[in-house]
Curated annotation (Swiss-Prot):
It holds the Pfam family DUF2705. This is Uncharacterized protein YybK. It comes from Bacillus subtilis (strain 168).
Amino acid sequence: MRIKGFFITLVAIIFQASLSSYNNNKNVFPFLDGIPISTSGHYEYQNILLWFVPIVSLSFCFSGSIRDTYISYEQLKLVREHSRVKWVTSQFLIITVVLLIFTLSQIAIFYIYSLVSLHNLDINSVINKRFVMMTLMYYLTLLNLFSFQLFMELYYKSQIAQLNISVYIIFSLILAKKLVQLNSPKVIHYFLIPNYSNGLRTGLSYYSQSGTAIIEPLLGLFIIIILQISIVILSVLKFKKIDMLKSEGLQ
């Protein structure tokens, strides 16, 4: 993990919190609420961009976590099958920890900004079951997306994997609104994983009346847990087949 990249991500969170405090002086954690479906196109794109800035910054930190390390000094050390499994699993564990730090940092920064703008803020009105569930969904969704980015690095260059994830996130958030307008079957929304992180789209947010719930929270939680387990297993299986010495696996 690159320290410089995480510092840039921290700056991006502060930037996000600063702009959010001007746009909304009541919502303490707007990044957990996400983007409402029932907004104008211009306002929607503005919200998506603001929500996405820290996430895309963090994606640069994760980019190359498997591919670059594999090509460098780790290549000759990972000849044994046991070492391969242990190493690739450790990469996902690193992501898990870093994303936890990222999420907690985001919560802390936004809370500080809210204390400044809302002097009589009651912590009991903010930290509750809804908040915990939204935070869990947000965290696991990001874990899912960045784990899949690492998984794609086993097949493609790290830049391509990162670009694919970024496009998928933006595409999913925009497409969800179009599908609602077309009255499409709700099952289609479950293929658009980034929406799981938006409280306004799961109905968990206190402001859900201003949006449309398209994801059932418990079902969404079950899906992303199954997906996460599957991504790790598939990554381990793929990595075990790589010929370390000939570098055929990631070339």
